[in-house]
């Protein structure tokens, strides 16, 4: 009788683990490519030339736009050369060819800084060129509905 109970318990554990991990995690992960994300649009300042160390010590301030997500997301890469992450909360927005918010492409959206927005665009690896691990090149940026 005890052997049956242990066998039943092990069967349940195997069944639960097979259905809840890693399949459910993978199903909730974003893939590189076109995505739709919602969060708050914020600005962050980083030091630029000449030393790339401190704005307060004279380095040029470089302002970037960040989409702070409502909740952390998982990002998985199709190849090992693309970074993966769990619970990523910040994605850098890049409009046009300039990642810094001084470019003319940013002007039509300045009124959205500090607001909740919805962004549809191409999710890309940030790499060394950008301040954040992931960037989104938006096709559409619009004000999001307020959360219930």
Q: PLM ranges: what are they?
A:
Residues 1-11:
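Bacterial N-terminal signal peptides that target proteins for export
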Residues 94-102:
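Short, structured beta-strand/loop micro-motifs enriched in basic residues and often containing a Trp
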Residues 32-63, 68-75, 121:
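Structural detector for short beta-strands of small beta-barrel domains
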């Amino acid at each position: 009788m005890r052997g049956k109970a242990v066998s039943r318990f092990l069967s349940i554990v195997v069944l639960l683990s097979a259905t809840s991990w890693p399949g459910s995690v993978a199903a909730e992960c974003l893939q590189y490519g076109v995505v739709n994300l919602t969060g708050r649009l914020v600005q962050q300042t980083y030091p630029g030339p000449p030393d790339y160390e401190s704005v307060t010590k004279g380095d040029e301030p470089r302002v970037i736009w960040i989409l702070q997500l409502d909740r952390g997301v998982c990002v998985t890469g199709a190849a090992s050369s693309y970074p993966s992450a769990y619970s990523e909360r910040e994605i850098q927005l890049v409009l046009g060819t300039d990642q810094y918010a001084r470019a003319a492409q940013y002007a039509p959206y300045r009124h959205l800084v500090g607001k909740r927005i919805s962004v549809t665009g191409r999710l890309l690896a940030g790499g060394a060129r950008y301040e954040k691990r992931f960037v989104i090149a938006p096709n559409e940026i619009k004000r999001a509905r307020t959360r219930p």
